[in-house]
Amino acid sequence: VLNDNAPKPPSSIYDLEVPILGICYGQQIMMQMLGGSVISGSGTSEFGKSYVKLNTKSKNIKLLEGLFLKEGKEEVWMSHGDHVATIPKDFEVYGVSENAPFAIIGNEKKHFYGVQFHPEVFHTLNGKVLIKNFLKLSNFSFNWSMQSYLQQSVEEIKIKVGNKKVICALSGGVDSS
């Protein structure tokens, strides 16, 4: 985030009026692009197991439903050198860790959220709950199945191919089809 050539999304992404969840670097770049700041970790890096404590004002945040039920803290997996130093004025702090004062932040009105930890890894014990909550906020449909994917794919192929013939080459390898 702090390098001049650091990758960043187009700023127009924040105008799409869709929920956004920035994870680790994603949180940092979102904060920097929206008016917050990021600083180098000098002495405040976190790698491995950490605990995020809930800000007591954050009890009714939909992103956090079903979380922080045990002593108001969650075990998470951190892996960062840099961290957010300031957040834009329209964001709130939902959770903090020992070295990340903005471990969970959000803007409920815009449905923009950021976490400094990694909910996608199994080391974050309730990471799947957080991700599922975000998907609910995004109006994600939970009815995907391999069968529905297969049906949809077959229909799309029939539309594309019509009455023409096709050749399908398929090997039996696990990762080659």
Region roles according to the model:
Residues 1-4, 8-19, 28, 32-177:
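RNA-binding accessory domains that recognize and position tRNA/RNA substrates
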